[in-house]
């Protein structure tokens, strides 16, 4: 997606729910990060793998790989291989049913008929009679992404259908998100008429409001990646008013904890961090906050000349005293270096994984309920 596009498919979950957010975000420049660059590199490897299979040129991907290859790891290779295999498996299945099925890689799509001045690039499309496939690769592992009624995927599906519906008799769309670092392959299938009804009744009117900056600011889980979340008044009021929702300010019942408090914890914690970061950034740029001042934070001493310090200390102490013992890199680092599969092959006999610390999550979380010997045989006493 072009960086300057106002209503991008990747942020559709946000501007569909909070139509005011798009114009507010446009006032704040987007900042790149090492995570974004890492994802760009992984996408380039994915596209190059598929294009090589199709015999297509890979000049653009080669350039990106050359520029960003400092992020390349064995883990990335495994993720790319898994994605390419997934796409090609779907493509071969489509060819059995539609002999002229097409696999399109990094396909530019136009959905301006539904979202003003909007276009985007789909990672992979398989165009065939009957069932069309839309496949999206996500290298991030911070948030698990599901395909069910995912607006980004549905917008891509619309663009693909608009472009290819005259060539193929498309009746349904299967949308697949491949998120290998979370072992997540999520699929969702929808009929074309249902997709078009959603586009006319929901997407088009909400996108029109978002493009004009109309509507109220509506806080929700879509605030997570909003560029104005640290200064959004609606989100601030929502977080600050959380405690005031309780009928009894002295005690919180289990029912109230489940209904009012726990669902808000993640959003409130994230908001607090964002406000701190935003306020500090503004203060560094000269903004004055009454009752507050900038001071120098805690500093950690650093050795500027390790060889020189070691030589000075070696006059009185042996090497085994002044040097730390050699130690292995962390398991995560080793997996990234050699790849998860290879590391599991050679390293599993030497690694154990204890039971994880219990944590409260919504019922919708796909992990099994926590169970321990203590919970099986004794009541839990909370002090």
Regions found by a protein language model. Name each.
Residues 270-383:
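Extended, charge-rich alpha-helical segments
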């Amino acid at each position: 997606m072009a960086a300057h596009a106002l209503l991008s498919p990747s942020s559709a979950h946000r501007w569909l729910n909070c139509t005011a957010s798009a114009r507010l975000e446009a006032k704040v420049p987007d900042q790149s990060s090492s995570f974004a660059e890492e994802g760009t590199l992984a996408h380039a490897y994915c596209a190059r793998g598929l294009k090589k299979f199709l015999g297509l040129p890979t000049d653009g991907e080669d350039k990106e790989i050359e520029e960003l290859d400092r992020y390349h790891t064995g883990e990335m290779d495994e993720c790319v291989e898994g994605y390419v295999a997934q796409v090609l498996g779907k493509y071969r299945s489509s060819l059995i049913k539609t002999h002229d099925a097409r696999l399109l890689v990094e396909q530019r799509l136009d959905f301006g008929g539904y979202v003003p001045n909007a276009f985007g690039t789909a990672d992979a499309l398989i165009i065939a009679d009957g069932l069309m496939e839309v496949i999206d690769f996500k290298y991030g592992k911070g948030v698990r992404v599901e395909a069910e009624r995912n607006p980004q995927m549905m917008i891509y599906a619309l663009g693909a259908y608009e472009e290819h519906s005259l060539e193929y008799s498309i009746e349904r769309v299967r949308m697949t998100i491949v998120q290998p670092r979370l072992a997540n392959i999520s699929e969702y299938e929808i009929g074309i008429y249902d997709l078009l009804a959603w586009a006319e009744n929901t997407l088009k009117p909400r996108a029109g409001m978002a493009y004009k900056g109309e509507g109220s600011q509506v806080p929700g889980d879509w605030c997570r990646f909003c560029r104005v979340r640290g200064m959004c008044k609606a989100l601030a009021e929502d977080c600050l008013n959380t405690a005031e929702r309780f009928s009894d300010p002295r005690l919180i019942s289990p029912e109230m904890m489940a209904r009012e408090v726990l669902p808000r914890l993640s959003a409130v914690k994230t908001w607090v961090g964002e406000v701190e970061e935003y306020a500090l950034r503004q203060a560094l740029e000269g903004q004055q906050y009454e009752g507050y001042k900038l001071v120098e934070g805690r500093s950690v001493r650093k050795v500027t000349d390790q060889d020189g310090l070691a030589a000075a200390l070696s006059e009185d102490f042996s090497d085994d005293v002044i040097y730390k013992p050699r130690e292995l890199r962390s398991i995560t680092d080793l997996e990234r270096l050699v790849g998860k599969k290879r590391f599991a092959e050679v390293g599993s006999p030497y690694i154990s994984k204890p039971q994880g610390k219990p944590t409260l999550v919504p019922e919708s979380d796909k992990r099994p309920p926590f169970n321990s010997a203590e919970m099986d045989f004794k009541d839990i006493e909370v002090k």
